[in-house]
Structure formats: structure tokens, C-alpha cells
Regions:
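Generic cytosolic/nucleocytoplasmic N-terminal low-complexity/intrinsically disordered segments
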Residues: 1, 5, 85, 487-490
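N-terminal Sec-pathway targeting helices
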Residues: 1-17
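Structural signature for solvent-exposed beta-strand/loop edge elements and short helix-capping sites
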Residues: 12, 68, 117, 147, ...
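Terminal hydrophobic membrane-targeting helix
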Residues: 20-105, 118-119, 123-139, 169, ...
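Membrane-proximal interfacial segments on either side of biological membranes
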Residues: 46, 60-63, 95-160, 171-174, ...
């Protein structure tokens, strides 16, 4: 028994001695420099670029490895990417990255320079600082499974600020599977149950592709992405619920079964669509088909109030009651195009085309109706139901509008409208085959309604200065008798 105890004690003493020797050796400059050189060599091969690190710390008792001051430069054809990590800790199968910095520089001016309507996001100018904690659940030669259980990333200048990130990732190095992903940007929360991704391979000629196997869901506050993409959303604090299936490649995106709604469900939208030519801003095409959009009384105005734009005809918008829409819209380079059918409690409007031209700063379009109760829409009881087709053009240039307001004042939009009225009713008068022309300089709107018959032409000129007081419109009638004019010509 004594012999056994001596042997056991000798083995333990030897192990402790070896641990002490290993601990002392590992903490010598020679061993640490060797380990640092080995780690840098492996990272350089993996990243295919020169990697630098200031120092390495190995804790033999806690089984931890810390790398400090890691940095690398990835040179691209158009952009240089700078990567650095203040410290990286390996503890068993857990990895902790502190102050991982990713900086890109394409040596060009920022895309929003001189363009205040554009957001600050620019892939050629990023300065992201991230902290990440992950655990490697499984790692073999041909597969890996890891859990990211804590992550943050911020780029103060662009407004990119992910304050919570976690997900589970599995890969066979040909495909990537992401499960139970959660991302929070400000107050916006995105849940991604599952995404399958085919990783690109130049050698095999395989491109990137991906698709969600279950709908992505989110609670979106558009204000959270305003600095990133468009300052116009800076006041949009109305929460929106989103559900969508997403698929695509590195050059396309497809959105199926889109469901968007407000928390009170007074506004709901169902649609599908996609984006083509992501890599070419000149060919970029965003197209959506709206299967159904419903906006209950007041909800359309509530959404419009979220935008910092001049609000015109808001009273008339309220008169429309519940609004529905079914149609299509496309966003092309410097142009947005809409079409479809708008339903209201006072009648339907066929939106044959509506074009917003960002180059000329004009909105133009063509609309028609067979049953619109125009008087109820405008708040003018004397006008009844109307059947008509109309074309219009309005000026949306801030510069031109500001100049006009300085000179004339006024509360009206600037533009023109021309309509062919098949049938309408004004007081007791029933009108057929009439034409209407209206023009507004922003301060005063003038209109002329002409009703032609075989015997006479009836003309009604009108003026108004405020769309909220249409009932105060001044109307001047005039009549031209054709019969006498015709007889006079025959006599001559």
C-alpha cells in the first residue's frame, strides 16, 4: 500500500512539476513569440493577406489564449478594407472578439456628399466597431456549428447601430444555414427563423444564392434606418409589423407574401415583388405588385404625418373615408411609377399612371372615374357624381416652390389639370361632354369648365386660394349662343 501511495504521489508530483515547467515556459518571451508567429501565420494564410498582432497571452491553468492588437489590410480592386481587433480570447470552444474594427475606403467622396436627401450608408466608407461572443458547438474538417450569443456593431457616422445580435450558424463550407437569428437596430427588431445560403465558388462557377424557409418577421420603426438610407424617415416613429419570405442572389432579391400592418391594424398591406440589377445603379429596378392595401379612416393621414413634407388637401383625404388600393409600382433610376385602382367611400379612382420624376422634379399622371362623388370628396355639396378622365402635372421642386412662395405667398401646389367630363352634376344642372382646365401658380388656382351643345356653350370660370376652403370658391358663369352666331354667318 505504501508503495502504491509513493508511486501515485510521484506521478502527481511529476504532473504538477510538468505543469509548473509548462506554465513558466509558456510565459517566457521565446515561447510566446513562437506562438504569436504561429498564430499570425495561420491567420495570414486564412485571410490571404498580411496580418499583424502586438502580443499573445496564454493562460495554461484557465486554458485561455488571448491575441492583442490584431490588424490586417485586405486590398480589393476598388476598395481597401482595414480589419483590426483590440483583443481576441479563446477559451475552450468559446471565442470573444473585443473592439473588432472594420474600415473600408474607396478613396472617393461619400455618396451623400452634396446630396442631403441621401442616407449616410456607403459601402465604400465604413467604420464599424463590433464586439462578438460565440461558442463553437461542433467543428470537423468538413463542417462547423456555432452559436453567436452576444453581438453589437456600431458605425456612428452612418447611423448603423446593431445593439443586439444572436443566431446559430451551421456550414459544410459549401452551404450556410442560419437559424433563430435575432437582430436589433435601435428599436427595430428582426427575427429570422431559418435561412439557407449557397456560398459562392469561383472555381466551380457557383454564385451566391439564399432563401428563407420560414417567413422573416419584424417590428420596424423606420426612424431607426433614416440616417442610414433616407433622412425623410427621421420622424417616422409609427411601429409597423412585417412578415415576408426572402430569396435572391448577389444581384437580385425576391420578396414573397409581404404582410405589413400597423399595430392597431387600421393599415394593412399584402404584396409581392423584387429588386433586379443590384450591382448596377443605372439598371436598378424595384417592382412590387400590391394585392391589397386597406387604410381605415384616419390611418392614411397618420402615415402621411410621419413625413416632413408639405401636406396638401388633408381635409379632402379625410373625406375619402376608408381607402383601398390594388396595383403596381416600380422604382427606377430617378423615377417612380404607380398604377392601379383606388377605392374610397365616395367612389373609385382608376390610377392609369402616376410618374414621379426625380430629375425634373415633377409629378404627372392620368386618372379616371365612373362613380366619384366629387362634391363629397371636396366638401362642396353643390357638386354631385362625376364620370371623367383627367391628366395632371404638379411641380415638386423645393427650389422653385420656395421662390414662388417668396414672391406670391400662397398655400396651393403648383401645377395644371386637364379633364374630359363625360357626365357630372352641379346643383340642378346635369352636365355632359364638358372640358375642364385648371392651373395653379401656388397662390391662386384658376379653372374653366366648358359645356358644349349644338345651341350654346356654357362656361364657368372659378378661382380659389385654399384647398381647405373649397366651399368659398368663386364661380362666374358665361353663355355663348351658337344658334345666333351660325345664322349670322349664313346671312353673311
Amino acid at each position: 500500500m505504501k508503495t502504491l501511495l509513493k508511486i501515485t504521489g510521484g506521478i502527481l508530483a511529476t504532473i504538477i512539476l510538468l505543469m509548473i515547467i509548462a506554465f513558466i515556459a509558456i510565459n517566457t518571451d521565446y515561447v510566446q513569440n513562437k506562438a504569436l508567429h504561429y498564430a499570425i501565420e495561420k491567420l495570414s494564410k486564412r485571410l490571404k493577406t498580411e496580418v499583424k498582432a502586438e502580443r499573445i497571452s496564454i493562460n495554461f491553468l484557465k486554458f485561455t489564449l488571448d491575441l492583442h492588437g490584431i490588424s490586417a489590410v485586405l486590398h480589393g480592386k476598388k476598395t481597401d478594407n482595414f480589419l483590426s481587433v483590440k483583443s481576441m480570447r479563446l477559451r475552450g470552444y468559446s471565442v470573444e472578439l473585443n473592439e473588432l474594427k472594420f474600415v473600408t475606403d474607396n478613396y472617393k467622396p461619400r455618396k451623400n456628399e452634396g446630396r442631403p436627401k441621401r442616407g449616410w450608408f456607403d459601402a465604400g466608407h465604413l467604420d464599424i466597431t463590433a464586439n462578438l461572443k460565440l461558442h463553437i458547438n461542433h467543428w470537423q474538417k468538413d463542417s462547423i456549428n456555432a452559436s453567436i450569443f452576444e453581438g453589437t456593431a456600431i458605425d456612428t457616422l452612418s447611423g448603423f447601430h446593431i445593439n443586439d445580435l444572436h443566431m446559430q450558424v451551421t456550414s459544410d463550407f459549401k452551404n450556410l444555414y442560419v437559424q433563430n437569428a435575432f437582430i436589433r437596430q435601435g428599436n427595430t427588431e428582426i427575427h429570422i427563423p431559418e435561412v439557407e445560403m449557397q456560398l459562392p465558388s469561383k472555381k466551380k462557377g457557383i454564385g451566391l444564392s439564399y432563401h428563407t424557409t420560414k417567413p422573416l418577421t419584424a417590428r420596424v420603426i423606420l426612424q431607426d434606418i433614416s440616417r442610414l438610407f433616407t433622412p425623410a424617415l427621421a420622424q417616422f416613429t409609427l411601429p409597423l409589423g412585417l412578415s415576408v419570405n426572402v430569396s435572391g442572389t448577389d444581384n437580385t432579391m425576391v420578396f414573397d407574401d409581404i404582410q405589413i400592418k400597423t399595430e392597431d391594424e387600421k393599415f394593412q398591406l399584402a404584396a409581392s415583388g423584387g429588386i433586379e440589377h443590384l450591382k448596377n445603379k443605372y439598371l436598378l429596378n424595384i417592382s412590387f405588385h400590391v394585392d391589397k392595401m386597406t387604410a381605415k379612416q384616419g390611418s392614411a393621414a397618420q402615415i402621411i404625418q410621419q413625413f416632413p413634407v408639405k401636406k396638401y388637401m388633408m381635409k379632402q383625404l379625410g373625406n375619402l373615408g376608408n381607402i383601398s388600393y390594388k396595383g403596381d409600382f416600380s422604382v427606377l433610376r430617378k423615377r417612380e411609377v404607380f398604377s392601379g385602382l383606388i377605392g374610397t367611400v365616395v367612389g373609385d379612382i382608376s390610377l392609369q399612371s402616376l410618374i414621379i420624376n426625380d430629375s425634373t422634379k415633377y409629378i404627372s399622371g392620368k386618372v379616371g372615374t365612373n362613380n366619384l362623388e366629387l362634391g363629397k370628396a371636396l366638401g362642396m355639396d353643390d357638386i354631385g357624381k362625376i364620370m371623367a378622365d383627367a391628366t395632371f402635372e404638379f411641380d415638386i421642386s423645393k427650389e422653385r416652390t420656395a421662390k414662388m412662395r417668396q414672391q406670391l405667398g400662397g398655400k396651393l401646389p403648383m401645377g395644371t389639370l386637364k379633364a374630359k367630363v363625360d357626365e357630372a352634376k352641379y346643383k340642378v344642372l346635369k352636365v355632359k361632354n364638358a372640358t375642364l382646365e385648371m392651373s395653379s401658380n401656388g397662390a391662386v388656382a384658376e379653372g374653366l369648365l366648358v359645356i358644349s351643345s349644338r345651341i350654346l356653350d356654357s362656361k364657368f370660370s372659378c378661382t380659389f386660394t385654399d384647398t381647405n376652403e373649397m366651399h368659398k370658391m368663386k364661380v362666374k358663369p358665361a353663355v355663348k349662343v351658337k344658334l345666333f352666331s351660325k345664322k349670322k354667318k349664313e346671312k353673311d
